[in-house]
Amino acid sequence: MKEAETARPVFGRRDPDARGYFGAYGGRFVPETLVAPIEELTAGYYAARKDEAFCEELDRLLKHYVGRPTPLYEARNLAGAGKAGRAGEAGRVGGVRSDPAGVRVFLKREDLTHTGAHKINNALGQALLARRMGKRRVVAETGAGQHGVATATACALLGLECRVYMGTEDMRRQALNVVRMHLLGATVHGVDAGSRTLKDAINEAMRDWVANVTDTYYLLGSALGPHPYPLMVREFQSVIGREARAQILEQAGRLPDLVVACVGGGSNAIGIFDGFLDDKAVRLIGVEAGGEKIAPGRHAARFAGGSTGVLQGTRTFVLQDEAGNIELTHSISAGLDYAAVGPEHAWLRDLGRTEYAHISDAEALDGFKALARLEGILPALESSHAIAYTMQLIPTLKPGSIVLVNLSGRGDKDVQTVIDSGGRVLSDPADRR
């Protein structure tokens, strides 16, 4: 695989319509005060992606700063445990080796990027855009903290002032990332409104942007919000799918049968899906947060319990009551704990091109444990949803099937949450026989 062919985005392949819609979803639902800044951003982005110097700098930084391309790793032990139907019992001495004729599982290792997650791909691209547009100050929201860390990292590199908004509940469960942001020079502002999670952080970041539009750039972290954000984020994240497609052809000799990724706003998923959208035989499966159960306020599975609505600038699938009030959400994973999904995901689902499932908190913890004890990899709790779903899926697949999973981030940030979950993950499997 030639690195020069995979690091830089291929812009302009799947643009929304002139109003920013993917089918019935997307658009721009913003107050009058944001119309001019959004138009400035749109013009700035379309100009930047045609600028060879901008593209070359992004390409160079993705390779030599972020560490792209990230590896594609075959998880043989995980595949064997999934075949045996033992996700909840993973970790017994000696591991489980897969049958060579059985299902093969490959992990796209976004956890190995600089900062430890896929978020840096988008943060770096948008930070370069902010500098190109003459903005000296960047504001961002964060849930799991990885986007905040990535934004603070990019701003430190490019000499930009950085302010990150984060719900106080997320600050509690992602305390390590709060410290990392401070160390990188960012100001972290706790948001104590509403559910004190990602939705509320986005509200505050957008208020800041409205009040400081002249010198401030809003660096949105997922494939949602008003146009052009869903397009920009997908294009900056499309490097994942483009690399993964070339790597799986090289290692396995053919395309995968399934591509699986967790879905909060949906940036890591849309990034890897983008490399396979034209390959109709490849199933694309997004995994949402099933939380405690599918009931109002107990989960964040928009396609399981949501309906079409508008939230924070975009029309998409939203968790809301009959009156259109946004429902509270819950997930053990801060990065999936959000009431809406990116509009392109909603459109692709309507087209029948993508499928969506959900995994509970308990199942995600089992996925976390399985990957740690079978492969020696600590996944983010977000990614653990995709791992857990894959292990449930393996026994249903034909021998020789290939599953590609996007391992969107590493789990260092989630250790305290895992500790707080009690003995489910930390106890020795032998003690529970």
Q: Model regions: which residues?
A:
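A short, small-residue-rich loop immediately preceding and capping a beta-strand
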Residues: H114, N122, A130-G167, L255-N268, ...
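Active-site-proximal loop->helix
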Residues: V139, H147-A205, I294-G306, D414-S421
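Glycine-rich ThDP/TPP pyrophosphate-binding loop and its adjacent helix/strand module
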Residues: K199-D208, D215, L220, L224-V282
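Active-site/ligand-binding loops adjacent to catalytic centers
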Residues: I202-P228, M232, A281, G286-I377, ...
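Buried hydrophobic positions in well-ordered alpha/beta secondary-structure cores of metabolic enzymes
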Residues: G27, P71, L107, K119, ...
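Positively charged, low-complexity intrinsically disordered leader regions
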Residues: E3-G26, E32-K135
